[in-house]
């Protein structure tokens, strides 16, 4: 488990390129037949990926020991979105078929979660966010047909994009975790511009669906002290509450956003005008 400490905005603005990457970038999300796990002290979110190929991958008691509990989800809830081939997730003996861009919410208290791919030639790639939970909500599969896509932006400003809200109050109940998937239209490059912060929750972006020769310049930092981190395919970045989170790519891309904190209202944002950025 890779543990990342909280960091003050006044400290973050003093960091060089490598310092910013060390604090905020999750460089390797998927490893064959393993799970990756980054634990952030910011709202205690856990971020990672699971890519089973030749065997199943379990997340259970061995992780619980690192969290001071008996098993991984004893006091946590889990959200998973599959960006790869078809797979299965078995939760305490109940098997769910999770296809490409299907998602599964797993409620607090599940003792064993087992991940598998159906075809080793096209393995599943399960990206997940995990957050502390105070009560148990039912485990539920969510498919792309069950979300309500919202298209925002304009081709003229190169930010036309479709937002798919998977884990939000209108779709299912969670304790605090919200997740969704945003896809840029072909030829569009910007996400979340004009940008915002949100004082009441943090966020993690996971960029994917990118060519090897493409990248995203992820904008971060306090609005008057902006910095950037260069992101490549299937990498994630941690965004504290005080930081903007926006990006511009060399080509169109897709990203998964995950938020935890004290408010699940999607539009609870502190907007920042483009003219006010520095």
Curated annotation (Swiss-Prot):
This protein's record includes keyword Metal-binding: yes
Textual note on the cofactor: Binds 1 zinc ion per subunit.
Gene Ontology MF term list: 4-deoxy-L-threo-5-hexosulose-uronate ketol-isomerase activity; zinc ion binding
GO BP annotations, alphabetical order: D-galacturonate catabolic process; D-glucuronate catabolic process; pectin catabolic process
Residue sites binding Zn(2+) per the record: 196, 198, 203, 245
Catalytic activity, EC: 5.3.1.17
Pathway(s) served: Glycan metabolism; pectin degradation; 2-dehydro-3-deoxy-D-gluconate from pectin: step 4/5
InterPro entries, per the entry: KduI (IPR007045), KduI/IolB_isomerase (IPR021120), KduI_N (IPR027449), RmlC-like_jellyroll (IPR014710), RmlC_Cupin_sf (IPR011051)
One Pfam entry name: KduI
Cofactor(s) recorded in Swiss-Prot or TrEMBL: Zn(2+)
Keywords: Isomerase, Metal-binding, Zinc
Annotated catalysed reactions: 5-dehydro-4-deoxy-D-glucuronate = 3-deoxy-D-glycero-2,5-hexodiulosonate
Family indicated by similarity: Belongs to the KduI family.
Function of the molecule: Catalyzes the isomerization of 5-dehydro-4-deoxy-D-glucuronate to 3-deoxy-D-glycero-2,5-hexodiulosonate.
Cited NCBIfam families: PRK00924.1 (NF002091)
Name this protein carries in UniProt: 4-deoxy-L-threo-5-hexosulose-uronate ketol-isomerase
UniProt organism field: Shigella flexneri
Lineage: Bacteria, Pseudomonadati, Pseudomonadota, Gammaproteobacteria, Enterobacterales
């Amino acid at each position: 488990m890779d543990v990342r400490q909280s960091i003050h905005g006044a400290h973050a603005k003093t960091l060089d390129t490598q310092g910013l990457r060390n604090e905020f970038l999750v460089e390797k999300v998927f490893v064959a037949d393993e799970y990756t796990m980054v634990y952030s002290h910011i709202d205690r979110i856990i971020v990672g990926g699971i890519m089973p190929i030749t065997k199943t991958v379990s997340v259970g008691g061995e992780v619980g020991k690192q969290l001071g509990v008996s098993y991984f989800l004893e006091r946590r809830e889990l959200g998973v979105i599959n960006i790869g081939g078809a797979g299965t997730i078995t939760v305490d003996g109940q098997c769910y078929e999770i296809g490409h861009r299907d998602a599964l919410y797993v409620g607090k208290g599940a003792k064993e979660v087992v991940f598998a791919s159906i075809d080793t030639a096209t393995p599943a790639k399960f990206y997940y966010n995990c957050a502390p939970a105070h009560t148990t909500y039912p485990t539920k599969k969510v498919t792309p047909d069950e979300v309500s896509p919202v298209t925002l932006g304009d081709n003229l400003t190169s930010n036309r994009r479709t937002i798919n809200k998977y884990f939000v109050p209108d779709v299912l109940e969670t304790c605090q975790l919200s997740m969704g998937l945003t896809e840029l239209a072909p030829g569009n490059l910007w996400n979340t511009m004009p940008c915002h912060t949100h004082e009441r929750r943090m966020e993690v972006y996971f960029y994917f669906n990118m060519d090897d020769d493409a990248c995203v310049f992820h904008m971060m930092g306090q609005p008057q002290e902006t910095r950037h981190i260069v992101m490549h395919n299937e990498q994630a970045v941690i965004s504290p509450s005080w930081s903007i989170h926006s990006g511009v790519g060399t080509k169109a891309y897709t990203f998964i956003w995950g938020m935890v904190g004290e408010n699940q209202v999607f539009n609870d944002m502190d907007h920042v005008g483009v003219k006010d950025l520095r």
